[in-house]
Amino acid sequence: MFAEAAKTTRPCGMAEFKEKPEAPTEQLDVACGQENLPVGAWPPGAAPAPFQYTPDHVVGPGADIDPTQITFPGCICVKTPCLPGTCSCLRHGENYDDNSCLRDIGSGGKYAEPVFECNVLCRCSDHCRNRVVQKGLQFHFQVFKTHKKGWGLRTLEFIPKGRFVCEYAGEVLGFSEVQRRIHLQTKSDSNYIIAIREHVYNGQVMETFVDPTYIGNIGRFLNHSCEPNLLMIPVRIDSMVPKLALFAAKDIVPEEELSYDYSGRYLNLTVSEDKERLDHGKLRKPCYCGAKSCTAFLPFDSSLYCPVEKSNISCGNEKEPSMCGSAPSVFPSCKRLTLETMKMMLDKKQIRAIFLFEFKMGRKAAETTRNINNAFGPGTANERTVQWWFKKFCKGDESLEDEERSGRPSEVDNDQLRAIIEADPLTTTREVAEELNVNHSTVVRHLKQIGKVKKLDKWVPHELTENQKNRRFEVSSSLILRNHNEPFLDRIVTCDEKWILYDNRRRSAQWLDQEEAPKHFPKPILHPKKVMVTIWWSAAGLIHYSFLNPGETITSEKYAQEIDEMNQKLQRLQLALVNRKGPILLHDNARPHVAQPTLQKLNELGYEVLPHPPYSPDLLPTNYHVFKHLNNFLQGKRFHNQQDAENAFQEFVESQSTDFYATGINQLISRWQKCVDCNGSYFD
């Protein structure tokens, strides 16, 4: 990714015309389903070298702190929104505006205020404005093969300036492991390791090393640019280990390649960037970003190639190249400070001694908390803890020792907890708490740490027998093979019936004050009013739909009549399909669909019927695609009569584009494949 690039005359960051993304039938998801949105790859059929995908940091060799551990306390904003002055997470001011854009993201890249988001322990809602990076990807991206730079990443949507784009996630490493990996690299290897350096206290710098080479996310595909459109900001949420969040430094248009300055700067070049050979003899890798201000070489951090005792962090005014992927070196020469050093700088007695000193100086708990966190880093002191000790001092007790307590332990062994849960996934958290003799909240907290979440069993249409599973497997595998040898998806005509309820409202929970009474909701009647619709469509679009009259049911004669009407419309819409290729009907095995009058009509019209296994609505495009979107459209709507329901359905079908129908048909391939992968069982 870093090693190869090509000069070009197109605007910096824009793909060439021949690199314009197409719409392949099957889209590879580089993110393996672990992001909010799939991340495609281009050109069709190509894929990056395999790596283990993770949307968040994972602990790597030599790391001081596990990035998945929760180390920050939460705010207590329950009835009021999180605001500076009242929310402990916003002690440095607001981070985002009403549009979820980073505030004060100046064109000079001078954004230096610490960013702390509300975390899992905060009592504010999930809709809090201070929760942005933790929500993951909000735009569609595509990994694509560049002309000579290897793989890159581009957006398929417009991204406003200041919006969060993605993280640079990977293994969090110790400095010795970073040096070991870098010294093992050859000239042809790409370097993905990034070092973030943050000023902490008294000239000390806190460093975070991240390597997505083997375990990472889409951030590993970002290429360097001397005029980048992204800016990297360390954002802390649950842990002292920052998330390396990339924000749009300007408005980014669709199909524009995403890039950032590997040195961590933004349009803030230093001198001596044109030095080709470094002091220790290593050749700089050339930069071909195509920017007007291109420095000709990729950024480089010589400190990572030196022994630990000789490695110093350079001043911003020193003539020394910066790291390939590091934050700007704008701090004085200073001692290397790791996260673990930061945590261990003060033990309990030392920090309690500071509490006592501040108390005797007459300072308040809030002021004491601010002073300590400003001096030793965020999260060192908690205001409620300081208040507890101040109350103790007020009583004349100035002992700094812990009082003996007979309560339950606040920690559990995660391996033991995992073994209990995996042995019986149906066990409750309270049963686990009783078995381990800990509080219920302790079990919940540790379950989150080991990545366990509670999920209900998923409803399935039927409890399949082995014969039915085998039939699903055989049909799906045969259709995959047939389509591979002779594509036929564009010949498929599919249909199904659905009841549309007059009342589509659902009872839902509400956030209310404790003494406030909930709203009333009428109990559903046993036989609600409804109307049945039959819809026929293909990849080219809608063909025909009709509604049953009240009291009317679908019979084989009625269904044969529907086929006749559909065929007449199909001849007007897709005459070539009817006369030359021949349509292929895909429907389920309902009794009217397989009755003799229906089979005679299909034989008369020359329709082929595609094999379909019983109890398989997950393999019918009308069920998994059209009706799914129709249900979302109807949610919350209420109709007074059949005409209102018919008008709503007509509004739904008229709002869909041709691509909507093609997408539903094209999903058949992936669904057949999932069925094969699950040996005929239902799949998620």
Swiss-Prot record:
Record-level GO BP terms: cell population proliferation; DNA catabolic process; DNA double-strand break processing; DNA integration; double-strand break repair via nonhomologous end joining; methylation; mitotic DNA integrity checkpoint signaling; negative regulation of chromosome organization
Origin organism lineage: Eukaryota, Metazoa, Chordata, Craniata, Vertebrata
Gene name of the encoded protein: SETMAR
Residue positions binding Zn(2+) 2: C75, C89, C118, C122
Primary role: Protein derived from the fusion of a methylase with the transposase of an Hsmar1 transposon that plays a role in DNA double-strand break repair, stalled replication fork restart and DNA integration. DNA-binding protein, it is indirectly recruited to sites of DNA damage through protein-protein interactions. Also has kept a sequence-specific DNA-binding activity recognizing the 19-mer core of the 5'-terminal inverted repeats (TIRs) of the Hsmar1 element and displays a DNA nicking and end joining activity.
Name this protein carries in UniProt: Histone-lysine N-methyltransferase SETMAR
Keyword terms of this UniProt record: Chromatin regulator, Chromosome, DNA damage, DNA repair, DNA-binding, Endonuclease, Hydrolase, Magnesium, Metal-binding, Methylation, Methyltransferase, Multifunctional enzyme, Nuclease, Nucleus, Phosphoprotein, S-adenosyl-L-methionine, Transferase, Zinc
Transmembrane segments annotated in the record for this chain: none
Tissue specificity statement from the Swiss-Prot or TrEMBL entry: Widely expressed, with highest expression in placenta and ovary and lowest expression in skeletal muscle.
UniProt-listed CDD domains: SET_SETMAR (cd10544)
GO cellular component assignments: nucleolus; nucleus; site of double-strand break
